[in-house]
Amino acid sequence: MTRWLCTLVLCALAGTAAAGNEGHPVTLWRIAGATNSVYLLGSIHLLREQDHPLPGVIDKAYDDADVIVMEIDMDDVDPVYTQAAFNRAGVLQDGTTLQDLMGEEAFTAASEAAAAIDIPLDMLAKSEPWLAAITVELMLLYRIGFDPALGVEMTMTQRAAADGKPIEGLETIDEQLAFLDGLPIDAQREMLLQVLSEGAAMSESIGELIEAWHHGDTATLEDAVLSSAVGLDELNEVLVNSRNRRWAETISTWLDDEQDYLIVVGALHLVGEQGVPALLEKRGFGIHQLSEPASLR
């Protein structure tokens, strides 16, 4: 589960120098429309300084695109509104506590696991379990040097703003939070318990994801996702598969357009039979994975 949530929150990139980026696939696809191209990039939400620059083929896809599309419209994000939205969706307002929602046995297990990785669970007393899980995950990622300000979305947002390229969103922040807040409480408990219990092994788990993402190794990414989501079918359906189907429907309408698009979403959404590339291929669109050295054809 930690690898699954890491993929959702992180999907990190490896490689400390340009030479390390050559001669391998990248988690990037080109779809040939009737009159245009659409690129699908597996998103890296948080990065470290040493993970830059991005592979050259990603830069070329960005340069080729007229429109940048992300899970949410990043150039329209209001930090004050976003914080308020998180508070509305995930902060308990009626006197109920995280301990109440977890139950005595699960909360005891969570407290012991949190203490083992030096996480002060008391500070999350007013959080719903899903928000507590994401908060813990981000705290652990920050500890090992990952930063959303260095991630692909922020990098692309800054470039698009400088270049005057429009950014569009597939969803809104409220929609994304509704997916999480609507999860059954049992699934939320499991999210938090798994993140805490596997937190000590996060560096190794992330290392595997980084290596797979860096080499465009979709088989390994898919295996990590599937093995981590065993027994969490409802969670996977709500947060991944149902969204993939909606996105594939939307993207298919852009494949008869005069504009070229670069679509940046979590790599979790681009692997396997239920991934967006596979869904679009089933609709009859030509699609292929791109590689370094940088070439779009």
Locate the predicted segments by residue:
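Sec-dependent N-terminal signal peptides
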Residues: 4-13
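N-terminal signal peptide c-region/cleavage motif recognized by signal peptidases
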Residues: 14-18
